[in-house]
Each structure stands twice: as structure tokens, then as C-alpha cells.
Amino acid sequence: MKFSPALQSATLILRYKRFLADVVTPAGEHLTLHCPNTGAMTGCATPGDTVWYSTSENLKRKYAHTWEITETQQGAFICVNTQRANQLVKEAIATHTIPELTGYGSIKGEVKYGEEGSRIDFMLQADDRPECYIEVKSVTLADRDNGYFPDAVTLRGQKHLRELMSVAATGKRAVLLFAVLHSAIERFSPARHIDPKYAQLLNEAQKQGVEILAYKAELSADNMTLKSTLPVVL
């Protein structure tokens, strides 16, 4: 996924009200960016970090600029725009980058399913195999080279795990794919210290046939590509 037009850089002053961030450009201009991330963004929003942002041509938008990537003062790249995770996964499926998800002729997004009124991120279909339901989660929380999800208690994430277990029980494929969007992360685990219920459900889901994958993106200010699988440590 190549950013076009190219992203612009600025220095982070402050993220606030979850959806807003104040930055200053190299030319000294102060801007307010839209922050497309509802999470805690721990370690992703330290004042002084470099922010890479895109600019919309939609004149109706209140905030024309969107925070896409953080380049930390330690040199790590982190994609904070959670919408990019699904785009990366869709691209990776289409280019056969994820071996576990090859062999399907049809890919559909945002399909209604489950008993709790959910929408699955992707559903893959083929004539010769069961349907494959894929839920995507974005991973940006890091402690050294360990990556964790979630970065805050997530009742929605717990619901998705229950829905995936129900899918697996019918004989269809249920896949939970963690898109790791932090360049320093080398392995993935559930954030038991933040949301123990989610960690418990993730273990239960694996035992009940839900496939758990973690794939890491190669990140820069120019482009992003889902590249390599990472070990999952439950």
C-alpha cells in the first residue's frame, strides 16, 4: 500500500479528546489532525514524536489532515490509523501473501453474521471448501519486542471472540488475524495484564477451533505491506 499523495511530517504536541492531535510542521505551522484511533495508543503518542499525516481533498471535512503513522523518538514506525489494518489484510489476501488464506475465489467485506449482531471483516468463499470468516485486529501496543492486544478493555473484542467460536462450532473456518502495525514487535500475546477476560476467551477460542494468526507489516512513511508471520504466545 503506497501512500499517494505522499504523507507530510510534523512534530506531535498533544493528542486529546481521543480523536484530535495538535502538531507543528517543520515550517512552524500549527495544525489539528484527526486521530482515527479510539484506543489508548500507549507508546504511540508521546509529545515530540514525528507524526506522518495525510490530507483529504474533501472540503466538507472539519479536519482535513489525518494522522497515519508515528515515528517514535526511538526510531520505531507505528501505523495508528486502525482502518489501514483491513486494507492491508485485503491486499495481502489478494496477492496471496498469507498462505493460510489462499485458495478462495471470492472475498466479501462487512458481512452480517452471528447471534450478537456482528459484522465480520472478511468472508472468503470457494466451491470446494467451507466459508472462512476473518476478524482483523490492529496491534500497536509494545513492550520492547513483545506486542499485545488489546490496549484497553474491549467488550466488543470479547463479543467477536464469542461469535468466532460459534462459527467454528458449525464447521466453518473462523480466523482471528492480528495485524501487527509496530516495527519493533517480534511476537504477539494477548494483553492479560489489561483485559484478562479477553485473554481467557482467546485461549478458549483457540481450543474450540478458532485459528489465530499474527502478521507483521513492513512500515515506512512511503508505504506499508503485510509481510511476515509472527509467533503467537498465549
Curated annotation (Swiss-Prot):
Q: Which CDD domains match?
A: SfsA-like_bacterial (cd22359)
Name the residues that span the membrane. none
Q: Which InterPro entries match?
A: SfsA, SfsA_C, SfsA_N
**Taxonomic superkingdom:** Bacteria
The Gene Ontology terms for molecular function here are: DNA binding
The positions making up the signal sequence are none
Give the protein family: Belongs to the SfsA family.
- Report what the protein is called: Sugar fermentation stimulation protein homolog
